[in-house]
Amino acid sequence: MSDLEQLERQILEDIAAAVDEQGIEAVRVAALGKKGTVSEKLKTLGGMSPEERQMQGPAINGLKNRVTEALSERRTELRKAAVAARLEREKVDVTLPVRESAASRGRIHPISQVIDEITAIFADMGFSIAEGPDIETDYYNFTALNFPEGHPAREMHDTFFFNPDEKGERKLLRTHTSPVQVHTMEKFAAMRDKEGRDEPIRIVIPGKTYRMDSDATHSPMFHQVEGLVVDKSANVVNMKWVLEEFCKAFFEVPSVKMRMRPSFFPFTEPSVEVDIQCDRSGPHVKFGEGNDWLEILGCGMVHPNVLRMSGYDPEVYQGFAWGMGIDRIAMLKYGMPDLRAFFDADVRWIEHYGFRPLDIPTLFGGLSA
């Protein structure tokens, strides 16, 4: 066996014996490094005669190429083995039950839970979710909703205003989610006019709203959900059916009596407030039974002025809308006495009233089962 054959055999044995990338790198340096055994052989070619170089050159270069290829193959094998070992170490048996300690580390906030419940119910009735900015213009928050400048109903909204900008326009924190109704109607009206797609509107709008209130039942920031339907045939009967189905599903009762009382909202005409049947004789309110009534939401047919300003002819289209405080109905359903506790970030309160993240109720299985 020649010296080159012996050297190649030794190097290949060292490569096969390497158990990690550090070992492979050590073999590479020993063989192909600046002072490596194969590199030293290559250096000898410079001192050979042309005849010797012609004989030895191909053999030494062939050795270098075979060693390089063997190093590459072994490095690839080791990398694959390392990945497989890591996957084996980190393998998770997804059929195992969740440990109680892991499941109890966090809770779904009641507000998030109730928003999910509300949107699930309306989604089952064919509604889509719409959203809009918290910072609004005076036009979208008031004027487009039939609150003209100087209208006394503006005083009912204790509004947070920003300082005027360089154009003199003063923006505000929206006092209700109703501006999203106007944005949506404008969008659908533009789509109708440009593309000829005259589609009905069926949306629910959950979100934050802001007013300067703070007591046990009011907060400067609170959550509201509104709904809007606009179509050529929308009517009060449709509205009553939608709201009755919602109340039955949300409060999980087979039937519920509703009472509508005349009211006033600038953006609807006629406007009504809805009370639902309940029993308040015990420590918790029971819905769908008893002789008591509890106000739950406000609603009405969209005012012709609002339709007109949003791009709809009130002689052709009709709509109905409703709105309710998410925080308030969460308090009613789950027996929470103080609205301010929703925003105190008290871990004990969350542990008591929150929902398990891996046991989230569904509409199909019962909202609060």
From Swiss-Prot:
CDD domains registered for this protein in UniProt: PheRS_alpha_core
Cofactor detail note: Binds 2 magnesium ions per tetramer.
Binding site for Mg(2+): E269
EC number: 6.1.1.20
Main localization, broad class: cytoplasm
Gene that encodes it: pheS
Subunit structure: Tetramer of two alpha and two beta subunits.
A biological process term (GO) from this entry: phenylalanyl-tRNA aminoacylation
Cofactor(s) named in the record: Mg(2+)
Location of this chain's protein in the cell: Cytoplasm
GO cellular component: cytoplasm
Disulfide bridges in this chain: none
Protein family according to the UniProt entry: Belongs to the class-II aminoacyl-tRNA synthetase family. Phe-tRNA synthetase alpha subunit type 1 subfamily.
Record keywords: Aminoacyl-tRNA synthetase, ATP-binding, Cytoplasm, Ligase, Magnesium, Metal-binding, Nucleotide-binding, Protein biosynthesis
Catalytic activity reported: tRNA(Phe) + L-phenylalanine + ATP = L-phenylalanyl-tRNA(Phe) + AMP + diphosphate + H(+)
Broadest EC class assigned to this enzyme: ligase
Domain of life: Bacteria
UniProt-recorded name of the protein: Phenylalanine--tRNA ligase alpha subunit
Gene Ontology molecular functions: ATP binding; magnesium ion binding; phenylalanine-tRNA ligase activity; tRNA binding
